[in-house]
């Protein structure tokens, strides 16, 4: 499917559901406890992230959309940490505080990128007065493009039938990430997004795609659903709609590090794209691409427009071309296993010219694989002025990816690619011009990893700025 990203800033999405705080304790394990046969983790860092429905809201905000969140919390430090983290990423919180219950908290202990144990601090919110939640939903419905109901069976969606009815009456599509086996609670929803295990718990074991289609179609009819999206892990996703052919999407994940919160990303991106004006099929395609990015990260994570742009134009099946940073890290790992030397460079590459081509060819000769990191449009404007870039990011990346010398192309939002370089850690970092190696962004990280940094010369007299001046002069403009 050919698709371009919509203007997510036009979208407004309301998320209602079970909010929670995800806590992560990280540290090395070098010995077994003398008290019991368990590893001892020496905790050296702690992290807190919004989880559950709050992670859905963060995924929406990370795309630049207007994200509003309604949920239940306690009156405690976890609630304050949750509110602070969400407000910091432009999620508008409208929580109902319940003094008699603690905020749901999940504590995960990790060592060497492996989760050792999870501890849950919760009582659930069953029996809490639903009226404050319903009032907040009613107040928020005008002006939003989609309602997401994120159900973790903790009590926030005790009156989910009423919530769906309110939204449908207001003409707002309702997307539900379900929980449990009683899907009758979601009667009349626009879309349900169960994973395969949740789906089979309701309809029985499916031995083939034909079973999924047949039983999914019956489920839609039974509960008056407008659509059903079954997420199927390594088998991708299947979208079912009454009267339409099934829409199967293969997975875009290159390597899975952590599936925590992947379902939150799917429904968050899907709802945002739908609210921004995409069709349901297009929205599912974008959600599938986003899931492929986020499972390559550790812990509950979000996806940025840049990562999504890279992912939907990637060629993961070939292992080369334009791709996301997460996909690139996987490919670089494979290249090193093959004994290949990885070279990396960066730039704006606005109007590609002979000087660029010569420089990139020379950089490629210094190793076996060449990565080109490209400034985003916003980054280019900050560096070059409001009239630049002439060519948008996707066009620049696609042209670079077509060059014989270039193996991989990624985009980055920052003014420099230092963060990306620190993540990728090439064997050789190359920069064109009259830089000193120690002044090149990312040089310290590459040296610390045992790599090298080298400066190459550009061809004299050839530059994008000069080309633009020549074009303007030739057109008779001053």
UniProtKB/Swiss-Prot annotation:
Pathway: Nucleotide-sugar biosynthesis; ADP-L-glycero-beta-D-manno-heptose biosynthesis; ADP-L-glycero-beta-D-manno-heptose from D-glycero-beta-D-manno-heptose 7-phosphate: step 1/4; Nucleotide-sugar biosynthesis; ADP-L-glycero-beta-D-manno-heptose biosynthesis; ADP-L-glycero-beta-D-manno-heptose from D-glycero-beta-D-manno-heptose 7-phosphate: step 3/4. GO terms for biological process: ADP-L-glycero-beta-D-manno-heptose biosynthetic process. Residues 344-478 are annotated as: Cytidylyltransferase. Gene3D superfamilies: 3.40.1190.20, HUPs. ATP binds at residues 195-198. CDD domains: RfaE_like (cd01172). Disulfide bonds: none annotated. Its EC number is 2.7.1.167, 2.7.7.70. It is an enzyme of class 2 (transferase). Residues 1-318 are annotated as: Ribokinase. Keywords: ATP-binding, Carbohydrate metabolism, Kinase, Multifunctional enzyme, Nucleotide-binding, Nucleotidyltransferase, Transferase. One of its GO terms (cellular component) is cytosol. Pfam families: CTP_transf_like, PfkB. It catalyses: D-glycero-beta-D-manno-heptose 7-phosphate + ATP = D-glycero-beta-D-manno-heptose 1,7-bisphosphate + ADP + H(+); D-glycero-beta-D-manno-heptose 1-phosphate + ATP + H(+) = ADP-D-glycero-beta-D-manno-heptose + diphosphate. The active site is at residue 264. One of its GO terms (molecular function) is heptose 7-phosphate kinase activity. Catalyzes the ADP transfer from ATP to D-glycero-beta-D-manno-heptose 1-phosphate, yielding ADP-D-glycero-beta-D-manno-heptose. In the N-terminal section; belongs to the carbohydrate kinase PfkB family. Homodimer. HAMAP family: HldE. This is Bifunctional protein HldE.
């Amino acid at each position: 499917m050919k698709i371009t990203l919509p203007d997510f800033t036009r979208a407004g999405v309301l998320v209602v559901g079970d909010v929670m705080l995800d806590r992560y304790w990280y540290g090395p394990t070098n010995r077994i406890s003398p008290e019991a046969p368990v590893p001892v983790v020496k905790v050296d860092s702690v992290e807190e992230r919004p989880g559950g429905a709050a992670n859905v809201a963060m995924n929406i905000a990370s795309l630049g959309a207007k994200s509003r969140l309604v949920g239940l919390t306690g009156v405690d430090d976890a609630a304050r940490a949750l509110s602070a983290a969400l407000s910091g990423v432009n999620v508008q919180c409208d929580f109902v505080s319940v003094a008699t219950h603690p905020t749901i908290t999940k504590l995960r202990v990790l060592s060497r990128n492996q989760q050792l144990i999870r501890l849950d601090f919760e009582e659930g919110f069953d029996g809490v007065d639903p009226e404050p939640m319903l009032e907040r939903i009613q107040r928020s419905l005008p002006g939003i493009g989609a309602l997401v109901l994120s159900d973790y069976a903790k009590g926030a969606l005790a009156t989910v039938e009423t919530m769906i009815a309110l939204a449908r009456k207001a003409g707002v599509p309702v997307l539900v990430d379900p929980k449990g086996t009683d899907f009758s609670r979601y009667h009349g929803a626009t879309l349900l997004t169960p994973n395969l295990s949740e789906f089979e718990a309701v309809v029985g074991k499916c031995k083939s795609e034909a079973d999924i289609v047949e039983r999914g179609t019956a489920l839609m009819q039974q509960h008056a659903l407008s659509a059903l999206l079954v997420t199927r892990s390594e088998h991708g996703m299947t979208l079912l709609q009454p009267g339409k052919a099934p829409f199967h999407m293969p997975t875009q994940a290159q390597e899975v590090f952590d599936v925590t919160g992947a379902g939150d990303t799917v429904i968050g991106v899907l709802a945002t794209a739908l609210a921004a004006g995409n069709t349901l099929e297009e929205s599912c395609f974008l959600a599938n691409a986003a899931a492929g990015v986020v499972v390559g990260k550790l812990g509950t994570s979000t996806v940025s427009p840049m990562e999504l742009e890279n992912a939907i134009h990637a060629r993961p099946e070939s292992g080369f071309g334009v791709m996301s940073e997460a996909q690139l890290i996987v490919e670089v790992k494979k290249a090193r296993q093959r004994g290949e030397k990885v070279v990396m460079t960066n730039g704006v590459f606005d109007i590609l010219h002979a000087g660029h081509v010569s420089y990139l060819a020379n950089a490629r000769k210094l190793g076996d694989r060449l990565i080109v990191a490209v400034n985003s449009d916003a980054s280019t404007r900050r560096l070059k002025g409001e009239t630049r870039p002439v060519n948008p990011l996707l066009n620049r990346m696609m042209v670079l990816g077509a060059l014989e010398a270039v193996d991989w192309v990624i985009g980055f939002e920052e003014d420099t690619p230092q963060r990306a370089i620190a993540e990728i850690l090439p064997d050789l970092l190359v920069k064109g011009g009259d830089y000193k190696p120690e002044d090149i962004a990312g040089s310290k990280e590459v040296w610390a990893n045992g790599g090298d940094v080298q400066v190459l010369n550009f061809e004299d007299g050839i530059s994008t700025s000069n080309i633009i001046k020549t074009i303007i002069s030739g057109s008779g403009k001053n």
